[in-house]
């Protein structure tokens, strides 16, 4: 099959697509075997290597901010005379947009309530548990997440815009292995980047489709089982794949605009009806707790099972997303200095995320108290209902419920469309305008792999999705650690 890639140089495509297809077939024909392997891999990595995930992300934080404040921070991502392609306002808006994803919509209500009911330490259901839950949520969605994207984006932008190398993860290793980035070692690095992206996105799409199906059940009574979730994934996959094939760029842009406006509208609506003063108090308290406990929480492993199920999952998820988000922030940052890039990428989206989480989480706690535990009970029964349980406690639920589903759909379509672009680019030698056929192929494959994880996981679908991220992120985490050294070596060599 010719998917618009040079046949002589598409090793990454052939190997990646073959492994992806084998994974799908494994889940279809041997689901119980896959489920057993999933459980064993999850236990192995979280039990034996949890410490490494925590240390790696801590190293990433030190590295990326160290580079930014050093003399290398003045270096441009591009030629010395390159100007930024976008104004500051446009650039900031794009980075803010990067923070609005399926995961944020999914977890912004569910996670605070889940930590409130089962905190990592202390008594559940107390004021202290509420404060701890919001602190932990800020921790999981804060700087520790975005430093991963900053490192991948910095590597892609520096070696593409300043050195003229392909827009591939393997290019970041040129200072270490030279032209061997075009050989087996470089191909292996790009293949690992492909699978980190596939499983990181599959986790997000799995969560998003589950929430859509639950919303349909919550509002219209249609059961939200694996079949419904699979149909949701299939239908949306067909939509964005057809849009890609047809070249309906205006349609995709319209969907992106709807996502932004709906996101802002929901934030304003929930802030107004969710208890403005309570939310502002929640934001202030949570931000202070986050900053005060930043270092200690970074290395905290006293409750290994909790850390394995939450923090390590998040760190792996963000690492798996690094090639995906990294290429986005790199593409829009040509002409920026390293210092501008690092501080904008790590702080602006985090600020937006904190506001979002404080509004949704604060409103959830406030309205849960007023309703006598309605939201808490809903989350205990099924955490995917959290957002709809919150909206049910506010006016205009007949309107906001369906609009919430529309918001999740726009997030799903946007993430899937961007993911297929990244996967097509990674498997076409860094071509920044990959063929529609190749993007369509990865769109279909992405949907199929997400369905496999949902069906194989069954009642434990979340664990299957978590394991997919943790397992795919492990080798890429090691790649990112070496990548940090390679970036530093390049900077020292180019700017002694």
UniProtKB/Swiss-Prot annotation:
One GO CC annotation: plasma membrane
Topology of the protein relative to the lipid bilayer: Multi-pass membrane protein
Compartments where found: Cell membrane
Position of the signal peptide: none
First-listed, main subcellular location of the protein, grouped into a coarse class: membrane
Description of what induces expression: Highly up-regulated during growth on glycine betaine.
InterPro entries recorded: BCCT_CS (IPR018093), BCCT_transptr (IPR000060)
TM region positions: 11-31, 49-69, 89-109, 136-156, 188-208, 219-239, 260-280, 306-326, 341-361, 396-416, 441-461, 468-488
Keyword terms, alphabetized: Cell membrane, Membrane, Transmembrane, Transmembrane helix, Transport
A single GO molecular function term of this UniProt record: transmembrane transporter activity
Physiological role: Probably acts in the uptake of glycine betaine. May function in the pathway that allows anaerobic methylotrophic growth of D.hafniense using glycine betaine.
Family: Belongs to the BCCT transporter (TC 2.A.15) family.
Name of the featured protein: Probable glycine betaine transporter
């Amino acid at each position: 099959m010719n998917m618009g890639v040079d046949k002589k140089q598409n090793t990454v495509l052939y190997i990646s697509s073959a492994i992806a297809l084998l994974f799908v077939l494994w889940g279809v024909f041997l689901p119980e075997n896959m489920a057993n392997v999933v459980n064993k891999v999850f236990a192995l990595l979280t039990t034996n290597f949890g410490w490494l995930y925590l240390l790696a992300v801590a190293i990433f934080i030190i590295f990326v901010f160290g580079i930014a404040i050093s003399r290398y921070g003045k270096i441009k991502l591009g030629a010395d005379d390159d100007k930024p392609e976008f104004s500051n306002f446009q650039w900031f808006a794009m980075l803010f947009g990067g923070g609005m994803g399926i995961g944020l919509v999914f977890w912004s209500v569910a996670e605070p309530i889940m930590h409130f009911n089962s905190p990592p330490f202390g008594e559940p259901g107390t004021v202290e548990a509420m404060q701890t839950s919001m602190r932990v949520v800020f921790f999981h969605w804060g700087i520790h997440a975005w430093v991963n994207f900053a490192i991948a984006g910095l590597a892609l932008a520096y070696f593409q815009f300043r050195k003229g190398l392909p827009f591939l993860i393997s290019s970041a290793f040129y200072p270490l292995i030279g032209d061997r980035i075009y050989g087996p070692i470089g191909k292996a690095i790009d293949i690992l980047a492909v699978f980190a992206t596939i499983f990181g996105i599959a986790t997000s799409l799995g969560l998003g489709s589950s929430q859509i199906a639950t919303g349909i059940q919550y509002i219209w009574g249609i059961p939200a089982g694996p079949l419904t979730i699979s149909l949701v994934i299939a239908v949306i996959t067909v939509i964005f794949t057809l849009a890609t094939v047809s070249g309906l760029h205006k349609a995709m842009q319209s969907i992106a605009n709807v996502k932004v406006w709906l996101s802002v509208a929901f934030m304003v609506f929930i802030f107004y009806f969710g208890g403005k003063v309570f939310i502002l108090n929640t934001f202030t308290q949570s931000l202070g707790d986050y900053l005060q406990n930043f270092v200690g929480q970074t290395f905290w492993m006293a409750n290994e099972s909790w850390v394995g199920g939450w923090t390590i999952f998040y760190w792996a998820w963000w690492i798996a997303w690094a090639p995906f988000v990294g290429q986005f922030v790199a593409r829009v940052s040509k002409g920026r200095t390293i210092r501008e890039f690092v501080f904008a990428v790590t702080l602006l989206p985090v600020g937006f995320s904190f506001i979002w989480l404080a509004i949704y989480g604060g409103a959830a706690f406030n309205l849960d108290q007023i309703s006598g535990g309605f939201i808490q009970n809903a989350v205990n029964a099924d955490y995917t209902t959290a957002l709809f349980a919150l909206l049910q406690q506010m006016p205009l639920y007949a309107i906001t419920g369906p609009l919430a589903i529309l918001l999740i759909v726009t997030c799903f379509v946007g993430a899937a469309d961007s993911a297929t672009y990244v996967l097509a680019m990674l498997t076409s030698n860094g071509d920044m305008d990959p063929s529609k056929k190749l993007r369509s192929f990865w769109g279909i494959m992405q949907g199929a792999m997400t369905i496999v994880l949902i069906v194989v996981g069954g009642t434990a679908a979340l664990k299957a999705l978590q394991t997919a991220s943790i397992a795919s992120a492990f080798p890429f985490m090691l790649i990112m650690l070496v990548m940090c050294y390679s970036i530093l070596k390049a900077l020292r060599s180019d700017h002694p």
